[in-house]
Amino acid sequence: MKNFSGSGKLTLREWWPNLLYLKMLYQNPPELNPYGRHFDYAQEFAKLDLDQLKEDLRKVMTESKDWWPADYGHYGGLMIRLAWHSAGTYRAFDGRGGAKGGLIRFAPLIGWPDNVNLDKAIRLLWPVKKKYGKKISWADLIILAGNVALESMGFKTYGFAGGREDWWEPDESTYWGPEVDMLQSERHDERGVLYQEVAAEHMGLIYVNPEGPRGNPDPKEAAKEIRMVFARMAMNDEETVALIAGGHSFGKTHGAAPTSYLGPEPPAAPIENQGLGWVSSYKSGKGPDTITSGIEVIWTPTPSKWNPRSFLYMLLTYEYELEKGPGGCYQWVAKDAPEIIPDPYDPNKKHKPRMLTTDIALKVDPVYNQICRKFLENPEEFEKAFAKAWFKLTHRDLGPRALYLGKEIPQEVSPWEDPLPEIDFTLPEEKDIVGLKKEIRKAIAEGKTTVSDLVYVAWSSAATFRISDKRGGANGAKIMFEPFRSFEVNMPERLDKVLRFLEEIKKDFDLKNQKDGKKISMADLIILAGDTAIEVAAERAGYIVNIPFFPGRVDTKPEFIDSFTAKFLEPIYDGFRNYLKSNIKFVRTPEELLIDRAQLLALTPPEMTALVGGLRVLNCNFNYSPHGVFTKRPESLTNDFFVNLLDEDLEWKEREFNLYEGRSRRTGELKWTATRVDLIFGHDHRLRALSEAYASDDGEEVFIKNFLKGWIKVMHLDRFDLHKERKLERVLENIIILPKF
């Protein structure tokens, strides 16, 4: 093995590739924000003159720059591509990717082959960003520029919402795939289906290879890939066709020559380039000599003007044959069409219509073809479908509708926006909360319910949240409805038992307070029951804790739930409950998936470690599994998990994948069983350091404090009202634990 030196260029993970990547648990810290840790972007956005900003963007569209000339004298196509590629990395299954943070400005995205020359689009927007400063984030500006591009070419958009705060460093939590090199594709199973943890066909592409799957120009196979990939972005067939047909009504691709003429991508470019990459050595390297994908296609006769029939008419009217363009890439040319496509730089030159393999896929796939023909015959329906799909594409990762900012928010509410009913009742007071807790405590003492069950259901309700797209969570009590109620990890029978118990409590409370119009929502009651159970478990361990409670959650209704997008909120892996969904081939290890889940829950390493150890001793494993339950005092909030994990008498051996036996070194007696998630806290030296702190003779209070910090955080991740008022921040800073004896 090579020696590690702090002065060496290799990172720890380059020396030891299997080292857990814990940095993803403390990304983009407030200290990185030059405006300060308490910068209020919503407050700044409210000062913005949106009309003037849009007027400035309209001027950008038609003021062609010599250093990067605009095709057809209009940057609209380029700005649509920038907005699309910024938002289009969104994956519905974990909420990562997308336009948030303005992450397309950073590696790896700015260096992807699919994003060649988008660095120039960002640079063209800099004068506007400079003018408005902190009032508009890059993330919002990029999406707004896409909208203005469409509007300036005659298309009526559906609306715009701000609220995307900028990041100040790359997001390294997203698993983009297993490949080492760009444009490789090692992410399909034996059936040709993409692995569950990725959403694009190739490393470095946002969707599919425009030449065809793995470079094979087969439109039928391309249609399969398109359907699979767009579905992972929560788009149905009609939305998919609307987006492709609408987006490809503008602009062109660029393949004046092979991509071998391109210089290094922005992160690898020389310092004198000042952040710009892909400097081309082919002729002028710009304008008519531009190389981006290496494909040279102009779809319509009106590349800088909206015409709802242009792309669809070109696609469906003519017969296309395969060719290789000047860039050496596969593309399709209309063999029976006249030269009707204008050249972007030579007014005396015309071209035949051309298409990508992925465009022809819409023609050969029978379902897509039918939608195309419907849209061609009903242009107004197509315009509306494209407008709505574009809004969804560019706003899916912004979070629930409650987080939208600005005056252009559409009035119509779509189910995918996760709307919630308004609170139409009086919330419980402090004395009511005390009374409800007493009732729950009494039921636990009488054996009507258990600490384990109440904690498990509260966690199940809250832990669907993803900080990535701010969806999921306890508000709405969606766990009472399908598809949430039937998620395997929620243990439906266990869930039903707890819900019946809590529904009786709610019924009695609402009835007693009918005159005052006071009610307790199931969403609030589920969390309150979990809090109460943890307080009981702490008392059993010898400590008194009081978990602050903030009523204000509301119960949703079935009609508010979009079942198509809701299914993506199912946690198919949750190390906190020692759960991996059966019959899924995961690329990453269980312990890597734990870190992934912890990041989605916005947890720090100390909070994650404490929560795993605490939930184990509270007997909160999926299917009541004994693995990792290192205690003889279950349902007591002790540090037993850490004490027993670090027992020097234990020797662990693998029995089968993800199952280990811990036996006494002295006697050979089987003491415990564990999964990889359990054992990682004794194996990874950073997590072991945390475990040692919690296992120490004076470590139990420290453990409980960090457990409570993690618990309170997870239970309130979707309480955006509390985050705005910074109430939770103050609570987490002032957790008090008192010894009972």
Please name every model-derived segment:
Residues 1-741:
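Long, well-ordered alpha/beta core segments of mature domains
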